[in-house]
């Protein structure tokens, strides 16, 4: 290769990233217009297209580089010089951290995810931790109650860029003050002030005002979800002011926010104070930088692995028929490998399973489906793998494993947040906790269905419980769109003997689902059956599911709330006359 080509290649990669992030910001900047026009289908399409931008631009850069090098192979020394030049371009670059991830992605695409070493890639960042360039304008604005909180909140709302009419601005301000007074007391509220992000956070059918409530006791989140009435008027649905509530809003089972962030590192740093339980990876994920979140997630894994003496073990729970799942006992994530052969009742291919996981990545997860990061050629030290797990890996996924002596390489796997399997949770709880879990499970099914997702396999073992007690679906191999399912009533039996026969007395076609059968799987436990019948009996009726299908086919997009119904102002406070 001619000398000097290394710098050209480095510049080409960085320019490619510039183009990608420019398009990312362009799609994001349309969120306000989509919200104001109540174009919810465009919201869903924009979410999908923004996810695809990254891989598309990586592909464009790879093609450029193949043209520049005339398709010639490059030696290790050449690649190291390219990385050196690229590193020198980053100190004054405003999005250095994601630019490093983009470099990694281009390298992996060129070299088929092989030879992934710290010398060749930005396994860890080349820049000082949490460094970002001086911010050209503040991320947030401070508001003080010099003339009381009513005046403060009126200024906050008046500063919003939204151009729609408000249904009742005074009512909403009254509700917010009432909530804050109940939480802090009048005297403490008078000594508090707000810092509000300049950009709104858009997701689904809501625009979120995100701020910090600075009180005498410390800083709290201040989140206001802004919705529209059927007449296109704005209203504030609730006010959330605890870290637990904020954590759920920014949770790993939700779609990414659309928030205009030309300096993502600065925004992540600003959010960190009100989301102390979130890792760097989770914060980048929440604002839509999912590929860099994958980089940060891998770094968090490496740091944990370096500081522990644990070995990988099979994850607790009922062993899956499609996936082999393992974890580190103290780590908050699980690793999922598609098995070489599935159980006989699972008539599907590995390609189908991967397509299902991609569907979840692109779809509105409504807080009920765990996000995943996909890895290829994932290297594990054998000393970190328990003998029992190693035996299981070789038994169930040998075709995906390459033995390198002291290491193995797993050709393909997913990393996902670790949860307590719902079936295990239900065995361990009773009373109100049991009731809450069954209520959450039914709500998860309803919300998935309203978002045009049918889980397929609805057994408790395919759901997990988060640290906030939310029930989340995580087994995607039988997932499909609601509109693809034929929900049927079981026909009346012809003779009494039909009910005792081993085979059904009626025909069953692919895609047929009989909701009445759910009762046999979900209500067998005498502790659970009565609760299910009380709260979710309609899930056993085919007409319930068909009615949902009709709403979806008519183009209706359901509201999705990242908080309990009882927290909504319309439920919590009686509307003013």
From Swiss-Prot:
Q: Name one GO molecular function term.
A: ATP binding
> One GO CC annotation, please?
cytoplasm
Family that this chain belongs to: Belongs to the AceK family.
Query: What's the protein name?
Result: Isocitrate dehydrogenase kinase/phosphatase
Purpose of the protein: Bifunctional enzyme which can phosphorylate or dephosphorylate isocitrate dehydrogenase (IDH) on a specific serine residue. This is a regulatory mechanism which enables bacteria to bypass the Krebs cycle via the glyoxylate shunt in response to the source of carbon. When bacteria are grown on glucose, IDH is fully active and unphosphorylated, but when grown on acetate or ethanol, the activity of IDH declines drastically concomitant with its phosphorylation.
User: Which InterPro entries does this chain map to?
Assistant: AceK_kinase (IPR046855), AceK_regulatory (IPR046854), Isocitrate_DH_AceK (IPR010452)
| Species, as recorded | Escherichia fergusonii (strain ATCC 35469 / DSM 13698 / CCUG 18766 / IAM 14443 / JCM 21226 / LMG 7866 / NBRC 102419 / NCTC 12128 / CDC 0568-73)
Extract one GO BP annotation from the record: glucose metabolic process
> Lineage, please?
Bacteria, Pseudomonadati, Pseudomonadota, Gammaproteobacteria, Enterobacterales
């Amino acid at each position: 290769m001619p000398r000097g080509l290394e710098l050209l290649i480095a510049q080409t990669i960085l320019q490619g990233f510039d183009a990608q992030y420019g398009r990312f910001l362009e799609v994001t900047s349309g969120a306000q217009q989509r919200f104001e026009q109540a174009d919810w289908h465009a919201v869903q399409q924009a979410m999908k297209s923004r996810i695809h931008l990254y891989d598309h631009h990586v592909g464009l850069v790879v093609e450029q580089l193949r043209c520049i090098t005339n398709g010639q192979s490059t030696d290790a020394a050449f690649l190291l010089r390219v990385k050196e030049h690229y590193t020198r371009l980053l100190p004054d670059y405003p999005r250095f951290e994601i630019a490093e991830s983009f470099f990694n992605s281009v390298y992996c695409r060129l070299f088929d995810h092989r030879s992934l070493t710290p010398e060749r890639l930005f396994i860890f960042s080349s820049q000082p931790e949490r460094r970002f360039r001086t911010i050209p304008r503040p991320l947030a604005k401070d508001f003080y109650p010099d003339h009381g909180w009513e005046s403060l909140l009126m200024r906050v709302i008046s500063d919003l860029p939204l151009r729609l009419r408000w249904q009742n601005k005074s009512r909403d301000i009254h509700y917010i003050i009432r909530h804050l007074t109940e939480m802090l007391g009048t005297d403490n509220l008078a000594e508090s002030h707000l810092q509000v992000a300049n950009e709104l956070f858009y997701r689904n059918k809501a625009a979120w005002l995100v701020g910090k409530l600075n009180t005498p006791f410390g800083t709290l989140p201040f989140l206001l979800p802004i919705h529209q009435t059927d007449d296109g008027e704005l209203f504030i649905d609730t006010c959330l002011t605890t870290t637990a509530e904020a954590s759920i809003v920014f949770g790993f089972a939700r779609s990414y926010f659309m928030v205009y962030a030309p300096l993502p590192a600065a925004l992540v740093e600003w959010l960190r104070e009100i989301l102390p339980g979130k890792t760097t990876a989770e914060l980048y994920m929440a604002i839509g930088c999912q590929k860099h979140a994958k980089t940060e997630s891998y770094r968090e894994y490496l740091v944990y692995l370096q500081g522990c003496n644990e070995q990988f073990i099979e994850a607790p729970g009922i062993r899956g028929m499609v996936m082999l799942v393992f974890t580190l006992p103290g780590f908050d994530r699980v690793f999922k490998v598609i098995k070489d052969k599935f159980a006989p009742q699972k008539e599907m291919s590995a390609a189908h399973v991967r397509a299902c996981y991609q569907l979840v990545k692109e779809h509105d997860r409504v807080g009920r489906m765990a996000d995943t990061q996909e890895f290829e050629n994932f290297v594990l030290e054998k000393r970190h793998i328990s003998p029992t797990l190693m035996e299981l890996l070789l038994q169930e996924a040998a075709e995906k494993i390459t033995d390198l002596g002291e290491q193995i390489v797993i050709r393909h796997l997913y990393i996902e947040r670790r949860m307590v399997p719902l079936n295990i949770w239900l065995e361990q709880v009773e009373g109100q906790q049991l009731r809450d879990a069954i209520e959450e499970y039914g709500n998860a099914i309803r919300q998935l269905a309203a978002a045009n997702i049918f889980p397929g396999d609805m057994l408790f073992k395919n759901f997990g419980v988060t640290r906030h007690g939310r029930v989340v679906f995580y087994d995607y191999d039988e997932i499909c769109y609601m509109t693809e399912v034929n929900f049927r009533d079981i026909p009346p039996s012809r003779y009494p003997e039909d009910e005792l026969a081993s085979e059904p007395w009626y025909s069953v076609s692919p895609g047929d689902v009989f909701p009445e059968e759910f009762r046999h799987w979900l209500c067998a436990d005498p502790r659970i059956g009565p609760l299910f019948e009380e709260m979710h009996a309609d899930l056993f009726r085919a007409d319930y599911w068909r009615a949902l299908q009709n709403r979806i086919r008519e183009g209706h997009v359901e509201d999705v709330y990242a908080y309990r119904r009882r927290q909504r102002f319309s439920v919590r406070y009686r509307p003013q006359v």
